[in-house]
Amino acid sequence: MKSRHILQWTVAMLLAVVTVLPAGAQYGNRGDKRYRDRYSRTNTYGDVVEIRLSEPGTLESKMPPEMVNKVRLLHIEGPMDSRDFKFLKKICDRSRCVDGRDKSVDNYIDVELERVRIMSAGSSGLFGSTGSHDVLDDALAYSSHLRSIVLPERLKRIGSNALHGCSQLEEVIMPPGVRSLGNDAFSGCHRLEFIVLPEGLQEIGQECFSGCEKLRNITIPRSVLEIGEKAFKGTALQHVTLPYGLTSLGSGAFDKTALIELDLPAATRIGDDYLGYMPKLQEIRVENGSRYYTYEDGVLYDNTGSALLLYPAGRNGVAVVPDGVETIGKYAFAGSAITAVDMPATVSTIGYRAFAESGIESVILPLSVTTVGESAFESCSRLQRAEMPGVKAMGKCAFKHCGSLKSFTTSPDITVIPQEAFEECKSLTSVKLPASVTTITMRAFKNCPAIADVEFPIGLTEIGKEAFEGCKALTAIDLPSALKSIGERAFKNCRGLSRVSLPEACKTLDKEAFRECTALAHVELGNVTSLGDNALRETAITVLVLPESVTHLGKKVAEKCKELTRIECHAVLPPTLDKESNSKIELRVPATSVSAYRSAKNWKNFKNILPLE
């Protein structure tokens, strides 16, 4: 019976190839206003074309060439494979057209594939070599003028990126048999506002509708079991009802939506316990019987109540964390409108981006808080003060981009100021670190232009890469005796810095460490052994004194130092020199080493090598 059916289908397809006539969608009431409007949109500058295929891979040969850029409504029947979709994509990605009045107009196209059967290229079976009936991955992605589409009636799965980036797509009509929507299937369809998900659908893939900015309403069928990460990110959803059987809700599924409230079914588990930033959210509730979550006063907690997972971002004023909470979860208050938070003495940990981009104005943590996670308060533009008396460990970027932050205090037990911890804190005027700090890591205070004073702890051993780069108000630094290394560009562009004295323990001055410190006129290098490329480039030094301990000089250590008149190198053996600069300047070396310098690589290029006086 099956082979007979195929034979009848093939014969029927051979009888008619191309017809110019109206066509209609079958998945709904054809009298519905949505459908009537859809067909009334065709106009005199385009036509309706119906094509019936007998073999896959023949769409291009059957399409009248003169219609490729004119067709407004294209109805296709019969078997199609990837070759046909490639040509169809070309039709849907055509350029704008010129109307009868010589004006450029949108060259939209509506496509009907209701009676299409999708095959793999070269397959002899109607459903492809895998036996499935899917819209291929990337099938019509970035079809810039596709306005609406009716999908094949036997469709089971819509592939990843199938209609991704179709910026003019307004409407999708899918058949009742669809069970799965692939990752990014409709993402970036900025004008999509109408779509009906069929009963029987079980899976909505990652970022499936991400960026569908006009999608305000959607009904999720009761059959859906899984919703992927960021599935509805950036949509205009204001209300959604999750099915009772939903077991998996991906991380950030509703990020940047307009949801005001949300009810979680008892069976649902949230990926990474993160629903996303919902700026209008006022309340979240959890169905009784959940093994994963509980809620109180519209706030989401884990099932024990010890971790606060989500505070509605639409609430303002002071947030009160109840007794018994031990952890503020990642993103818990991120982007919220709160101005302050009242924490109990039970809280010990603040998670990743817990308060990032919130409206908080001051932070006074209880002594019980020992850990502040990565980016915990990043980009809190109104934050002016932070007191962290018990914090022993702080994640990178903890206060990055807090442009109003004027002061902070930390625990006397903290040992590391982490990467980018206070970068771009433009109102910070002074830094006083506890004696326990041994390391200031890369970019910790980069581009803090108002910092005029830094009190370094006595036990500090390392200043990392770009740690104070761009701190233009810094005029003087007193480096502690324990300091061993200064990283790349650590003080670059500190234009107010006038004097630097390296301690005896400091052996490494990395490349560009003081580059563009245009007021730096006096440098004492202590017992340094290595100076990196451009370490003192574009400074105001007049005499560069290299200690006896130096063994290596990078490229152009003192390049473009306009006030430099003399270099004194006290090393008996010529240090390795990667590339000379200022070779016309007088070079003074130990009297017994003059001949050695005159024959040493790169040193020999100096024009005037004289003994030290």
Residue ranges: model-predicted function:
Residues 10-20:
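Bacterial N-terminal signal peptides
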Residues 26-34:
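Cleaved targeting-peptide boundary
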Residues 35-61, 65, 95, 294:
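The feature captures the LRR N-terminal capping module
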Residues 58-67, 84-93, 122-124, 161, ...:
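Short, T/G/N/S-enriched strand-turn elements that build extracellular solenoid repeat scaffolds
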Residues 138-139, 159-162, 182-187, 205-208, ...:
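Consensus positions within tandem repeat domains that build extended binding/scaffold surfaces
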Residues 21-25:
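Sec/Tat signal peptide C-region and signal peptidase I cleavage site
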Residues 46-54, 72-80, 100-134, 144-157, ...:
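Structural signature of tandem-repeat unit edges
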Residues 2-11:
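Bacterial N-terminal signal peptides that target proteins for export
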